Amino acid sequence: MSVDPMAYEAQFFGFTPQTCLLRIYVAFQDHLFEVMQAVEQVILKKLEDIPNCEITPVQTRKCTEKFLCFMKGRFDNLFGKMEQLILQSILCIPPNILLPEDKCQETNPFSEEKLELLQQEIKELQEKYKVELCTEQALLAELEEQKTVKAKLRETLTFFDELENIGRYQGTSNFRESLASLVQSCRKLQSIRDNVEKESRRLETQ
């Protein structure tokens, strides 16, 4: 059998020409074996009808096998020639013929050099895409950080607004005065707390 892959023919037919011929070869061999078995059975039956026949079934089987080997050898020789003819003249696509799906190659030929350049360009674009993706992730992380800082800043401003409102409530319109008043109040509260703790410890020791 031929060893040429014939990939273009396989693309067109949907099967390799060698596979087709191999199936024909196997089918003929199977048919030849079946025919020889049937012929052998007929010969044995005819020999049984002959009185005092000296030909035994074993001899008949040997003769049948020899004839089968002869027929198989002849067929292999003829099939080799037939295979070569079919592969070269029937199941073969001429070099100047393009399949419909490959017609674009005729109008837009693409060489190996162009393919290498295209692959290189694709590789460079993939690298650029990775860089852009990393940059985008970094920007998103920075944006989230800015959102967090903005939220904290808003809380701080709200806190200062509340301090200013407290100052107005206490009669001080200036923020510094309000802050000083608040610090003074905190110190008074801390002093009161310290006195309470001291008194509590004194009572516990008594």
Swiss-Prot record:
Keywords: Cell cycle, Cell division, Centromere, Chromosome, Chromosome partition, Coiled coil, Kinetochore, Mitosis. This is Protein MIS12 homolog. The keyword Coiled coil applies. Belongs to the mis12 family. GO terms for cellular component: chromosome, centromeric region; kinetochore; MIS12/MIND type complex; nucleus; spindle pole. It is found in: Chromosome, Centromere, Kinetochore. PANTHER family: PROTEIN MIS12 HOMOLOG. Residues 102-206 form a coiled coil. InterPro entries: Centromere_Mis12. Part of the MIS12 complex which is required for normal chromosome alignment and segregation and for kinetochore formation during mitosis. Essential for proper kinetochore microtubule attachments. It holds the Pfam family Mis12. Component of the MIS12 complex composed of MIS12, DSN1, NSL1 and PMF1. Also interacts with KNL1, CBX3, CBX5, NDC80 and ZWINT. Its main location: nucleus.
